[in-house]
């Protein structure tokens, strides 16, 4: 029997949140889970499905989330946008590790201010692409380089793979901003989101109209890799698998430039593809984060601090897990 208190997944009855609950259950059958949401019936259905779980109603308008004083959790994973930040307040008030997935780069200030005021538990800022999956793969491949000069990331999300209503609302909110942040030659600057001519190349070579975007990878990777240029382009369109008449997938292409450990210099390309779309990748990113925050991997639990996925989770381990769960991650031919 697990000695851990339940892991609270707020939004756990939504499409990706439920996927994360199932993934965490698969990795750790004994860890209790609480499925939190506004609709008790939906939360109860997911809790019943995964087992060793309970359903709780969450009220984000209240600092106590509407929970009874006797409730306690080992960690909180936040799958919905919380414009009150009451879930983060609750986590800090109760010294509970917290993971947020829906905050934009232009919205992070209030979260950091709350954390700086009361840094009582670890806080994983998980709004990197697919919960940090892209950055974890980049750190894994960057180990082939002695120095990294630039990182270019291009994500192709299939238009049939938007997920549930909460995910669609997040997408609309995060992509309506007029400017996105990028690092070029060591200098931060804002770029027009709808910059003319931006395209994303699918893994079968098609040019898909895209836009600049700045998930948290853009400002975490310069720190973790030393890169002086980091850019992220995004497109919503037809993935290679669906173009072939198969179900949609999700695609991330990565280009790393710098001096390799074999003494050569140049640009290497890599591909990260999951044949079932973005949900299983994001879900596993969250499950690995919870695992590391709580020390479920046999190591000490994470200390209080601000973290990105690649500063918390061991990248090589994550890549192996992604592959085991169906992803293809490899250097491009």
Named regions from a protein language model:
Residues 10, 14-18, 143-269:
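Active-site-lining helix/loop region of Rossmann-like oxidoreductase modules
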Residues 73-80, 91, 98-100:
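N-terminal Rossmann-like NAD(P) cofactor-binding module of classical short-chain dehydrogenase/reductase
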Residues 2-21, 41-54, 72-75:
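Conserved N-terminal glycine/acidic-rich loop preference
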Residues 36-40, 59-60:
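N-terminal Rossmann-fold cofactor-binding loop
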Residues 57-75, 83:
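Conserved Rossmann-fold cofactor-binding substructure of NAD(P)-dependent oxidoreductases
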Residues 102-122:
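Rossmann-fold NAD(P)-binding glycine/threonine-rich loop
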Residues 236-333:
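C-terminal active-site/capping subdomain that shapes the small-molecule cofactor and substrate pocket
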Residues 121-143:
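Short alpha-helices
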